[in-house]
Amino acid sequence: MRKRLFSLTLFAFFHATPVASQSKTAARGTQILWDTYGVPHIFAKDRNGLAYAFGWAQMQNHGDLLLRLVAQARGRASEYPNADYLDEDRWVWTLDLRGDAERSLAAQPRAIRAHLDAFVAGINAFARAHPKLIGDSVRAVLPVQAVDVLAHLNRVTYARFLSSSTRTRDDARAWRDRGSNAWAVAPKRSASGHTLLLQNPHLPWSDLFTWIEAQYVAPGVNLSGAALVLSPVLEIAFNDNLGWTHTTNTQDGEDLYELTLSGDGYLLDGVVRPFEVRTHVIRVRQADGTFRDDTVRVRRSLHGPVLEEKAGKALALAVVGLHGPPLYGALTQWWDMGRARNFDEFRAAIRPNQISGQNITYGDRDGHIMMFYGGNTPVRPRGDRSYWEGVVRGDSSSTLWTSLVPFQDMPKTVDPPSGWVQNGNDPPWWATFPVVVHPENFPSYLATRTMALRPQQSARLLDADSSITWDEFLRDANSTHMLLADRVLHDLLPAAKASSLPDARAAAKILEAWDRQADSSSKGAPLFTKWWTEYKRRRPGQRLYATPWNERSPRTTPDGLADTAAAVAALGAAADSVTRRYGSADVAWGSVYRLRRDGLDFAGSGADGEYGVFRVLGYSRKEPNGKFSATGGASWVAAIEFARPLRAASLIGYGNASRAGSPHRTDQLALLARKELKPVWRTRAEIEKHLEKREHF
């Protein structure tokens, strides 16, 4: 019976004439010109045509992935084969992401609602036209609805970056550790006299973090850039006049409240309030194809959902945007940002401040640059950062927040005297040097006060060159210099050379000859990173550096080693470990750290930002031979020079497609290995010269 119902559902979908008619209307006159890297260049008469074709294009390059993301956003991923998503499904229901998406859909302006409808119409139309390209395991997800897109955006924002379940917390932490880079260089600092912009988010190379590159061309719009799969708009992009990128910031977007239970409710200001209780049943597919039911019972207070209960207390979670003033305008804001023609229009576009947890680094043809500490921070009624990062009393309304810090009160570095801005997921205070935004002028809960090694290296690269050429800009964007080495080797090497440990003395010679890079040919780099791991292991919870970081010397601290004896012992152990595993302690970085996909295998260049490396690659998949394959880091990379004509180059190292059998799964991997970018073609004439195929609607 179940199989028959499934077949009838698919028949209804594939013969759904009203949707087909809507699709044809939205798409009429639209073209997709696919270039030789699998990038869709969409030419349409209006935004709905763009949206339709973008949905179609995403299905063509990422169809099965997109449908898996829809299932996950519905909180129903556990229903499908080969899924292990029960924790994630439970988290989706706990946060009520679907319910918030339904409320958001009802609140969308007419134009964005039509955009969403056209986008999902394109998705569904592709599935009807190419059913053989849809995997059996995800076909039942169809059809996709507009609310699914908003639920997915909620999941990306609230269930991964601002808050995360047990399952996703490790992914979120790994992503934050790798971080993102952003640069904007004003004409006064550029050798050509034109503004330069670097877009460089670092995300895992799979699942909901997957990028797709595209171009939108319609009256009033000529936008190139990238979007995460299942986004109906370009999220990091540029037009002929301006561009922007995002880096996740240090805002505290969630709070934990301790509630005092009383009967079936909880106390607030001395009054017992009832919980809102909802029950959801998740169908979980078993290995034999049968299903079992898993029940999720969510108790929700005024603060948010209850996560734990014990001894008359409960722990409730408040997430900015979900529990408090709603944030339903992100899609409109991204669209308006892409249509802006100058700084004033762009500033007006971002004023609603609807994109949670994201900085905006901006540059334009007129020479303006900016680093805006964007996203949403509640106006907190009391306490400093440490107070709100702990568990807050939930029995008094005095700790509840009901409004957000307004746009005009958020930190912004605009057109600084230095001629450059940067962000590497550090707080807004050190976006440039000399510093122009001071933490003393803002609430203490707004941002942390620290600067990690990677953003220090970012600032160092920009500040070292008073006249940056295009080639230097690209070279510096691929820098693998390990700033950590500069801070600790001056203590480690003399101590190791004087040591009685033969392995440590030999290792010191290797590190002395090492180029302090994480390039593929850098001999000694694996030894250095293994040593740092060993050193940290020997000092759990203890100070690592002789001089800790301090904001009076933000670019020269931390420095030195707190315990040289432990460091020397760690070096001997690291040398022994690397030798046993790889045959030599001076093995090259690229011999251990690899770029692998679909049978291709290249030496890697780049490392984790923990080491102060600007070009970030994360190698978290360990192979049987002890080597590691890249699974994240530099994902979308684009460099733009706002010259006439505009010059741009980009890269998605893992390719612009995930569909099995697509040549565009691997055609950019060699470029990544060589530290190169591909050209961005924006004019029809350029695209026609590099045309793979053409589609008309």
Which residue ranges define each predicted feature?
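C-terminal/peripheral segments of proteins
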Residues: S23-D503, K509, A513-F697
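Sec-dependent signal peptide recognition
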Residues: R2-L8
